């Protein structure tokens, strides 16, 4: 297994256990030589996964819709950052670039990505 897609929220949850879990996921994957493919954000759980994987020397590939790049939420420190036209292309690229997926808490967008991956 080379890379896993991580589906998670861009918000910072009230309970810090979720941030700790996101960091553990990123660090754990990097320690095993497994790259991270994720939503490309620098905030919330997304940012925690990316930052911890990068800090551990891991590969982090962000996939972010063009509309979100303009609002300055894109993580500029990713190994690769793919800017795509919209959510459909984002979900397709998640599938193309990864060998499996992990879902950690998020909102409606996370659930949408999860169901797309399952189907």
Residues covered by each model-derived region:
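A cross-family phosphate/adenosyl-ligand binding-site feature
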Residues: 1-97
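Conserved phosphate- and dinucleotide-binding cores of soluble alpha/beta proteins
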Residues: 84-96, 100-119
């Amino acid at each position: 297994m080379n890379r896993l897609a991580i589906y998670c929220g861009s918000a910072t949850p009230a309970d810090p256990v979720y941030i700790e879990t996101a960091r553990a996921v990123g660090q754990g994957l990097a320690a095993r030589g497994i790259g991270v493919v994720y939503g490309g954000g620098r905030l919330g759980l997304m940012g925690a996964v990316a930052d911890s994987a990068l800090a551990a020397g891991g590969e982090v590939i962000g996939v972010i819709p063009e509309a979100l790049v303009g609002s300055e939420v894109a993580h500029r420190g990713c190994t690769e950052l793919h800017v795509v036209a919209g959510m459909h292309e984002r979900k397709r690229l998640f599938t193309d670039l990864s060998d499996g997926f992990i879902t950690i808490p998020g909102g409606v967008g996370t659930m949408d990505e999860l169901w797309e991956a399952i189907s």
